[in-house]
């Protein structure tokens, strides 16, 4: 029986590395923890075949058969990618999975996604703090020359590190209810303050056997490459879970974030 497919997606600096480390503690889960090219490859196949002249020439008279060939091939590619895991479930991490959720469910209807969330000001603060530690190296998209407000503004642009996944998150209410039911939203703040309860609830939602993690004794996986991101987005693992540093954000930047993304705070961080 093929393993259950679990995608990890969501916002940057929102605990996806920690989540994958915690998922890997479960004996029935195979989780390598690295960002995976699987989603990018499936999107690339769709783009490539949609422009292929041989494929297009078949659509007029044999659309159903040709489309079935493509669906079977993409389904087989995903299954083949995950088949060697040898566990009940396999985890694949890519920030683009939320953007591609309907494509994923078309070829793997039982797939589920875990969407990582964090206060947007703290996400910006985490990125800015790491930039100050590595200020002699530019970002991969050349944001070092901006002032702090300008850099924050650029990070939230629709094609940048924070803005791009936010667009996918903003589109979630437009998805059919059946699709939304395949999504689990996990706040970083809850994960680091209540890790045992969070993971127990998550394992149950995934339909896996109960398992209690030990936050003070965590096994570590193979480290992910940080140089590809110019050392701006580190993927550190630790053997013990500790509360993260709180980042002090300039009030002007925090106010701008909360004003521009009111929907985010209303949906995921409502006032109690």
Which residues are covered by each model-predicted region?
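Conserved phosphate-donor/acceptor-positioning beta-strand/loop module used by diverse small-molecule
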Residues: 93-94, 104-130
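Glycine-rich phosphate-binding loop used to anchor ATP phosphates in small-molecule kinases
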Residues: 70-103
């Amino acid at each position: 029986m093929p393993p259950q497919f679990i995608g990890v997606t969501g916002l940057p600096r929102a605990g996806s590395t920690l989540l994958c480390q915690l998922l890997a503690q479960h004996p029935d889960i195979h989780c390598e923890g690295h960002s995976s090219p699987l989603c990018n490859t499936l999107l690339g196949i769709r783009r490539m075949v949609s422009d292929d002249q041989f494929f297009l020439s078949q659509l007029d008279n044999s659309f159903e058969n040709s489309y079935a060939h493509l669906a079977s091939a993409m389904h087989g590619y995903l299954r083949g990618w995950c088949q060697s895991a040898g566990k009940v479930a396999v985890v694949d991490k890519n920030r683009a999975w939320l953007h591609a959720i309907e494509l994923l469910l078309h070829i793997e209807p039982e797939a589920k996604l875990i969407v990582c969330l964090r206060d947007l000001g703290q996400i910006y603060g985490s990125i800015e703090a790491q930039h100050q530690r590595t200020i002699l190296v530019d970002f991969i998209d050349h944001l070092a020359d901006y002032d702090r407000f300008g850099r924050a503004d650029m990070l939230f642009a629709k094609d940048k590190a924070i803005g791009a996944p936010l667009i996918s998150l903003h589109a979630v209410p437009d998805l059919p209810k059946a699709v939304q039911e395949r999504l689990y939203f996990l706040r970083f703040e809850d994960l680091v303050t209540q890790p045992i309860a969070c993971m127990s609830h998550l394992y149950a939602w995934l339909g896996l056997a109960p398992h209690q993690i030990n936050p003070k004794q965590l096994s570590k996986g193979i480290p992910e490459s940080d140089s590809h991101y110019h050392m701006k987005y580190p993927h550190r693992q630790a053997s013990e879970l500790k509360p993260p540093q709180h980042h002090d954000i300039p009030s002007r930047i925090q106010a701008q974030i909360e004003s521009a993304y009111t929907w985010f705070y209303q949906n995921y961080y409502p006032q109690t």
